Every structure is written in structure tokens, then in C-alpha cells.
């Protein structure tokens, strides 16, 4: 079995603000988003409806970062698959600080959910690692996140791979 462990995070939530996109010296895009997830329950003692919101820092790399910057906006609902990472940094006074983030890179997935929101992408469009190419995508639709069906690839992901990305693995069984 997996003797090295598993580090996989799956979130469905709404953006708390517009994505912040930056470019690394090598030209690769990096997008930072803040994702809110909420759970609600009824208090057994009072019968009162309660809700708790958790905020998550998410970092997207490469084509996913570009797609996020172009199509996601504050309030957009999104499905994220990534890994949990904690990084260490120093503040201006030299104190060590730690930040835990969900990192979405080559093996991760970002899928836009819901309808158009002020010029966003059509409902259900997604982008996966390698710009949506070479890996199974999540099925379209509300809350169905398992299964083997593949969807057509969105037009914004048809740009050629940059030199620092591995070659694309095309599926010979194209559904269109």
C-alpha cells in the first residue's frame, strides 16, 4: 500500500476575493486565492441553526493560475484538488513565520462550478494539471466528483506547452 502516505486535499468553496496573479522570473504564473468553505448544523440544545466558515489559502501554478486569474472572481464557486504544504518565511523583523496552503500544480485540479458571474467562464468549464490535458477531468455537474467520464477540453487550454513543462500525453480516444 502507500507506505509514504497520502497528501491530498479536496475543497469546494467560494472565493473571498479576486485571484492575485504574479509571474515568476522563469515566466510561470502563480495565483493566490482565498477559498471559503462552510458547514451548517442545528444545535441540539437550542434548535438554532449554526454555521461555521473556514478560510483556506490556495496557490495555483502554471496554466491553472492563468485560467484562475482570467475567469475567477470574488464569490466564484470552485472545486480544488491539491496537496497541503507548510512553508517557512521571515517577516520584516526577522521572525520566522509559517503558512499552510493548498498547493495545486501538475497533479492537481481546479474546476469552475456554477454559472457565469460577470464575464466568467461558462458553467462547468474546468482546467486540470498541464492545462487540462493528459489527465482525467472531473465530470460536469453539481456535486458529482467521482466517476470515469471525461469532458471536452476548454478552448482557453489549447495553448502549446511552455519549455519547462513535460510533453503532453494526448488521449487517442477523443470524445468529440
From Swiss-Prot:
A Pfam family hit: SSB
Chain ranges for the short sequence motif Important for interaction with partner proteins as given in the UniProt record: 171-176
Transmembrane regions: none
Keyword Nucleus belongs to the record: no
GO BP terms in the entry: DNA recombination; DNA repair; DNA replication
Gene Ontology, cellular component aspect: nucleoid
Domain of life: Bacteria
Compositionally biased spans, kind Gly residues: 115-134
Portion annotated as DNA-binding: 55-61
Function of the protein: Plays an important role in DNA replication, recombination and repair. Binds to ssDNA and to an array of partner proteins to recruit them to their sites of action during DNA metabolism.
Subunit-structure text: Homotetramer.
Protein name in the entry: Single-stranded DNA-binding protein
Amino acid at each position: 500500500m502507500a507506505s509514504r502516505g497520502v497528501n491530498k486535499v479536496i475543497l469546494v468553496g467560494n472565493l473571498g476575493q479576486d485571484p492575485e496573479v504574479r509571474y515568476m522570473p522563469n515566466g510561470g504564473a502563480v495565483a493566490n486565492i482565498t477559498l471559503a468553505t462552510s458547514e451548517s448544523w442545528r444545535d441540539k440544545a437550542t434548535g438554532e441553526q449554526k454555521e461555521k466558515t473556514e478560510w483556506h489559502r490556495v496557490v495555483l501554478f502554471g496554466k491553472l493560475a492563468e485560467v484562475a486569474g482570467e475567469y475567477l472572481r470574488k464569490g466564484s464557486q470552485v472545486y480544488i484538488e491539491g496537496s497541503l504544504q507548510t512553508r517557512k518565511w521571515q517577516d520584516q523583523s526577522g521572525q520566522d513565520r509559517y503558512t499552510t496552503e493548498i498547493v495545486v500544480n501538475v497533479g492537481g485540479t481546479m474546476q469552475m462550478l456554477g454559472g457565469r458571474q460577470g464575464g466568467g467562464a461558462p458553467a462547468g468549464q474546468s482546467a486540470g494539471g498541464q492545462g487540462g490535458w493528459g489527465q482525467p477531468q472531473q465530470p460536469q455537474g453539481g456535486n458529482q466528483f467521482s466517476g470515469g467520464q471525461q469532458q471536452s477540453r476548454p478552448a482557453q487550454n489549447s495553448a502549446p506547452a511552455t519549455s519547462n513543462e513535460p510533453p503532453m500525453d494526448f488521449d487517442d480516444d477523443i470524445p468529440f
